[in-house]
């Protein structure tokens, strides 16, 4: 079995592992008492690893990767950039856009959230999904639904924990909701044009590390999500996460260097001719023909099922999951998902289009998947409007 990525506490030792095939050197950066301690990591194939002889639970950390600076070749190596662990599950703050995040040689330790070594959390007991196809799925934005709710305690408004409150559950049950579909709750960064306009991204479709919950939406981290899922399950309501695995918030060539881009962009993003492919409309596209990208995606899904008991996932821009040059209905990711003991029975919902060539793939996902159907949506809208 391959070694686990991220931070792993084993008794009195904490092991760190990150993938960066083309880096010349990688440092583990530990933050405590207002100081940064840098520890050289050792190469292990395409990975870099380090061990710290203590239980680092609660400690903040990040990485720095050194090597060639050649963005035209997918090499954004800059040791001045603090990088978030792609396998981080907890962050100490939200992301905030700053142009310094894109500038070579400008240190960003003060700007980038630090990953937090998480406390041990056992797996939930395996259970079949609470939702079966045919029931009502209620798509919701956590903050928008709860931030002004008068019957939710003020401290919980706008958070995942608010969904476990009796008033919210009663509302869902009055509507006969079979499952809630939570719009993205992992940490994201605002697109670079928004701050100057006095705007912010409220939907969350611009993630950086796919397992790291947003500290604003889920201040209690995994324990909060886990408790909320359990509370909804107790009332017969399933939980589906809207998840963005098709791109990162590092955008195009002018985007911020936050995680995968600084670790080795060419090892994660699609760029067959050296140019970033933009099948997502977000500046970059993760390469699901790459086994390492598929592993990160599968580890992410497995993490939320094992640690929190979620019932399934809605996949943003689903065709990206099956792209080589075009869409492949027999793509490896689909087969690996179907063979995974934690994931095979989950509810899987595709948004069956992206911005790439042949991007409209309604009806071509595996038979055990559900699909968003824009034709039904448009027909339904016309019917109710009387068009």
Segments from the language model and where they lie:
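Conserved alpha/beta catalytic core and glycan-binding cleft of carbohydrate-active enzymes
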Residues: 88-91, 309, 324, 328-387
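The feature marks proteins involved in alpha-glucan
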Residues: 1-13, 36, 42-139, 146-155
């Amino acid at each position: 079995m391959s070694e686990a990525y991220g931070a792993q506490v084993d008794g009195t030792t904490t092991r760190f592992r990150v993938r960066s095939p083309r880096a010349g050197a990688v440092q583990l950066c530990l933050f405590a008492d207002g100081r940064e301690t840098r520890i050289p990591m050792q190469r292990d194939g395409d990975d870099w690893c380090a061990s710290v002889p203590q239980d680092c639970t609660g400690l903040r950390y990040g990485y720095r990767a050194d090597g060639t600076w050649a963005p035209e070749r997918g090499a954004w190596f800059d040791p001045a950039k603090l990088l978030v662990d792609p396998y981080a599950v907890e962050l100490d703050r939200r992301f905030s856009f700053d142009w310094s995040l894109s500038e070579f040689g400008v240190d960003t330790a003060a700007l980038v959230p630090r990953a937090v070594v998480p406390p041990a959390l056992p797996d939930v007991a395996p259970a079949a999904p609470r939702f079966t196809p045919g029931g009502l799925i209620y798509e919701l934005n956590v903050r928008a639904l709860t931030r002004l709710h008068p019957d939710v305690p003020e401290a919980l408004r706008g958070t995942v924990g608010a969904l476990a409150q009796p008033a919210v559950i009663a509302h869902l049950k009055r509507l006969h909701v079979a499952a809630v579909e939570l719009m993205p709750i992992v940490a994201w960064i605002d697109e670079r044009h928004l701050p100057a306009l006095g705007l912010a991204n409220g939907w969350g479709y611009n993630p950086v590390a796919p397992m790291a919950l947003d500290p604003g939406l889920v201040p209690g981290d995994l324990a909060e999500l886990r408790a909320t899922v359990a509370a909804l399950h107790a009332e017969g309501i399933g939980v589906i996460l809207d998840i963005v695995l098709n791109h990162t918030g590092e955008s195009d060539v002018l985007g911020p260097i936050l995680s995968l881009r600084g670790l080795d962009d060419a090892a994660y993003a699609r760029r067959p001719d050296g140019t970033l492919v933009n099948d997502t409309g977000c500046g970059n596209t993760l390469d699901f023909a790459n086994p390492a990208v598929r592993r990160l995606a599968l580890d992410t899904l497995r993490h939320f099922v094992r640690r929190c008991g979620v019932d399934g996932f809605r996949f943003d821009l689903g065709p990206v999951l099956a792209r080589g040059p075009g869409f492949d209905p027999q793509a490896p990711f689909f087969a690996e998902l179907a063979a995974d003991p934690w994931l095979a029975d989950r509810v899987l919902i595709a948004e069956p289009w992206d911005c790439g060539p042949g991007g409209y793939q309604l009806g071509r996902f595996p038979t055990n998947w559900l699909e968003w159907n824009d034709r039904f949506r448009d027909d339904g809208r016309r019917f109710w409007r009387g068009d």
